Amino acid sequence: MEREKFSSRLGFILISAGCAIGLGNVWRFPYIVGEYGGAAFVLVYLVFLLILGLPIVVMEFAVGRASRKSAALSFDLLEPKGSRWHLTKYIAMAGNYILMMFYTTVGGWMMLYFFKTLKGDFGGMDAEAVAGEFVSMLANPALMGGFMVIVVLLCFGVCAMGLQKGVERITKVMMVCLLVLMVVLAVHSMVLPGGGPGLEFYLKPDFGKMVESGIGEAVFAALGQSFFTLSIGIGALAIFGSYIGKERTLTGEAVSVTLLDTLVAFMAGLIIFPACFAYNIEAKSGPSLIFITLPNVFNHMAGGRIWGTLFFLFMSFAAFSTIIAVFQNIISFATDLTGCTLKKAVLCNIAAIIILSLPCVLGFNLWSSFAPLGEGSTVLDLSLIHI
């Protein structure tokens, strides 16, 4: 039976970009750009993106298109006799499930904060109270678990509708809204009084700062970001290659996806740094940037409730686009390996993902004594390199 395809090239590009565009584009990329010399770091990053990231995206698309299967079976069909490339499927499958253990939980945080900001829960709070709200959420396993389950059900529900009617149709709308929201938020931040120094900090090439931070460290950060920003290495993009028709150029599609991913990461900095500098609030990285620093920024901003709501809507779309894309990959693992129906694959994986996500939910409260990377670390720290 012929494999289902996307109904349009735009749909393929937006969904593949949605898989690549993750939370790390917002809470990691802008910070390391500012930390390692602004535009000087971006130049190094772009070099690695061209010589490492882009070729691997092309390779993943090629493997998917040649096999017409997910990473669960692609190398079984393509490998030379006697080789062991098929063993990579276990790494790919494990990588997708592990990534979703964290992403579904953090996606729930984004949805919760969207509703909290929409209701005006942060209005009038000082910095300490905003931080207390985040700590309170982490201490509530029922609240986090509930939103995690909602995210899992919503995103698998999209996948259950099929590639064209579900994944493509809904992700296209989310990605277009995401890009529009980014432009609106970036323009608003850049015109804030006092935001100019933030733009200078972010965009001005400062090779002296790169040397001061350590050339080796900056190069390693650029190398790592170029690899992980595109969600490569776990077969997440290979599944979309399996839907590409032979009339399309793989390199051209890979360039489009890479450019969109880079654009979103770059524009995130245009949102964050001018706003933080305008209100003299330190821009940090990681979850604290999103859930503590930026709510404080919005509290200082005229119309902050509206801008905060739009920001967390944008972040929810960024999280959901990745989750839906990876869920589509996970479902394909099941259907390719077992030949089961789409409905059965969805139902089984809903249960699997919810159970596997519980350690992340409980790792901040009931299981908080578990420190996987040493004292002071949490379960979420295992995933921060990627997201």
List PLM regions with ranges:
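Loop-to-transmembrane helix boundary motifs in multi-pass membrane proteins
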Residues: 5, 11-13, 19, 141, ...
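Transmembrane helix-boundary motif of multi-pass solute transporters/channels
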Residues: 11-48, 235-241, 252-255, 259-260, ...
